[in-house]
Design a protein with these regions (language model features):
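Hydrophobic side chains within alpha-helical segments
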Residues: 66, 73, 102-104, 124
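Short, charged low-complexity intrinsically disordered segments located at boundaries
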Residues: 61-67, 100, 146-152
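Helix-rich "cap/lid" substructures immediately adjacent to catalytic or cofactor-binding pockets
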Residues: 2-93, 142
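Short, glycine/charge-rich beta-strand/loop segments that flank catalytic centers
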Residues: 53-54, 90-93, 97, 122, ...
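Glycine-rich nucleophile elbow surrounding the catalytic serine of serine-hydrolase chemistry
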Residues: 95-104, 108
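Alpha/beta catalytic cores of group-transfer enzymes, especially the acyltransferase/condensing modules
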Residues: 11-14, 40, 84, 105-152
Length: 152
């Protein structure tokens, strides 16, 4: 088998129900979600699978939730292939919080530590903009001059 690269997602790719089929059908995935719940002393899995979208979108929940789903997929792949992730993966990368997931995927961080770090990171990011209205817009296909005019 050729070695491959994995890029783990950042915040914004979350959706209620993500990972539920993994949880229901693979013991290794269930073990990941259970470990995250235990580390955070919270039933985050319930929020991930059945929760309110606004609750999942809270940065303090989103970050460990996305890590949990990604690591659950890693553990299922390891189990199905009968190989450690590092045996069939050449490189791991992550976008934003995905960097933590990539470290966890190669056992540089354990699931419990990654969960706790991402909760702290999520809380810090959430609190940094608590009383500030923020927005983000993606601009695709416009010339730089037009964008600069719009920003003035």
């Amino acid at each position: 088998m050729n070695k491959i690269a994995f890029i783990f997602p950042g915040q914004g790719s979350q959706v209620v129900g993500m990972g539920l089929e993994l949880y229901k059908n693979h013991l290794k995935a269930k073990e990941v979600f259970d470990a995250v719940d235990e580390a955070l002393n919270q039933n985050l899995s319930k929020i991930i699978f059945y929760g309110d979208e606004e609750q999942l979108k809270l940065t303090s929940n989103t970050q460990p939730a996305l890590m949990a789903v990604s690591i659950a997929m890693v553990k299922v792949m390891e189990n199905e292939l009968g190989k450690k992730f590092t045996e069939f993966t050449e490189i791991v990368l992550g976008h934003s919080l995905g960097e933590y997931t990539s470290l966890c995927s190669i056992n540089s961080l354990d699931i419990s530590s990654a969960s706790k770090l991402l909760r702290i990171r999520g809380d810090a990011m959430q609190n940094a903009v608590k009383n500030v209205e923020t927005r983000m817009v993606a601009v695709i296909g416009l010339e730089l001059e037009i964008i600069e005019d719009l920003l003035r």
